[in-house]
Every structure is written in structure tokens, then in C-alpha cells.
Regions:
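Conserved beta-strand-loop-alpha-helix junction that forms the acyl-donor binding cleft
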Residues: 105, 131-141, 159
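Glycine-rich phosphate-binding loop
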Residues: 108
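Conserved GNAT acetyl-CoA-binding A-motif
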Residues: 121-133
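Conserved active-site alpha-helix within GNAT-family acetyltransferase domains
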Residues: 111, 135-153
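Terminal substrate-recognition subdomain of acyl/acetyltransferases
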Residues: 1-7, 132, 157-179
Length: 179
């Protein structure tokens, strides 16, 4: 599925599905977003972070539940969104990563893309969306609250993901989608 989203930075394309040719662009995005990786994980990004996109899943979900979206400005990948459908319950979706390149932050791109994907989720029968909210990345919590999420207390790690050495606790942010 491909969406074209009008934003303050121009027309952005959101694509559901990664291609093998996307890996260099994702590595470049991750390197550009080392501020986020260092704040959240305590270390810069690395090739293992790209690989974990495909393998990190909450308990009780399968690879068929995983959705990875790229956000593109022309040919350049400027964002990545990692979603697991059916978690924490059948009609929910969990956002594990919503990453926007520093060059495109603070200009409405994230909100425009999120609103398109939230509308698609609502139309697809999703009634709850959860997201990870890190105390060490307060702008992420501000973004989630602006979208209408409620940010809860720190939570324990779940699923098959191993926390990094400098990783701070994560809070679950929750948004109830109205039909």
C-alpha cells in the first residue's frame, strides 16, 4: 500500500513494505537519527538495529502481524514506522518505532503521516493504538500527547526484545480510536 501525504515539506510518500534496496537508505536514516538512538538506547545505531526491525515482536504475535512503513521525500527515506497488529489485543496496533530524520522534524511531517495511518487503522477495525514513550526522548511524548495519546507509567520490557545497556524504562502511550 502506498499513500501520498501533503505536508509543510511537500508531498511525502508512505509505503508499507520494505524492499532489499531500502537497506542503505534505512541505515542512512538510522545514522542521521543517532540522537534518538543514543537518548533511548544509550548507544548509536548499528546494522543490528535494522535487523531487529524484522525480528523484534511482542509475545503472542507473529511475523505476519508486523508492518514496516517507510516515509520518503523523493527517493530519500526520511522516516520509518514499525507497527505490530493484534497487540496488546486483537483489535489493537502497537507502534514500536516512529522515526523521522532530523532534517524533517518539527515541520508537521510526523503528524501528517500519523494522522493518515491512524485513519487507515480506524477504517481497518483497529480501536486502540499503543506506542513506546521514552522519558529520555521528551519530544516523542509531546508528539504522542499532541496526537491524543495518554502516556502511562514506566512498563517492563515485553516480547523477545532485549534492552540495551544504557536503555531507560519505556512508558506505554495509548490512543483509543473512535469509530
Amino acid at each position: 500500500v502506498i499513500w501520498t501525504v501533503s505536508t509543510d515539506v511537500g508531498r511525502i510518500v508512505v509505503r508499507e513494505q520494505l524492499e532489499p534496496d531500502d537497506e542503505p537508505g534505512i541505515l542512512e536514516l538510522f545514522a542521521a537519527c543517532d540522537d534518538w538512538f543514543e537518548a533511548v538506547n544509550g548507544t548509536p545505531s548499528g546494522p543490528g538495529d535494522v535487523q531487529s526491525l524484522f525480528y523484534a515482536l511482542p509475545e503472542g504475535t507473529s511475523f505476519d502481524d508486523k508492518r514496516l512503513f517507510t516515509v520518503r521525500d523523493g527517493d530519500k527515506i526520511v522516516g520509518l514506522i514499525d507497527v505490530v497488529l493484534g497487540f496488546p489485543h486483537r483489535t489493537a496496533a502497537a507502534v514500536g518505532l516512529f522515526l523521522v530524520a532530523p532534517s524533517h522534524r518539527g515541520r508537521g511531517l510526523g503528524a501528517a503521516v500519523a494522522n493518515v495511518l491512524l485513519a487507515e487503522a480506524r477504517e481497518g477495525g483497529i480501536d486502540t493504538v499503543t506506542a513506546s514513550a521514552h522519558d529520555t526522548w521528551p519530544q516523542g511524548q509531546t508528539f504522542l500527547r499532541a496526537l491524543g495519546f495518554t502516556v502511562g507509567p514506566p512498563a517492563e520490557p515485553s516480547g523477545n526484545r532485549v534492552s540495551g545497556p544504557g536503555e531507560a524504562p519505556v512508558r506505554r502511550a495509548t490512543l483509543t480510536l473512535q469509530p
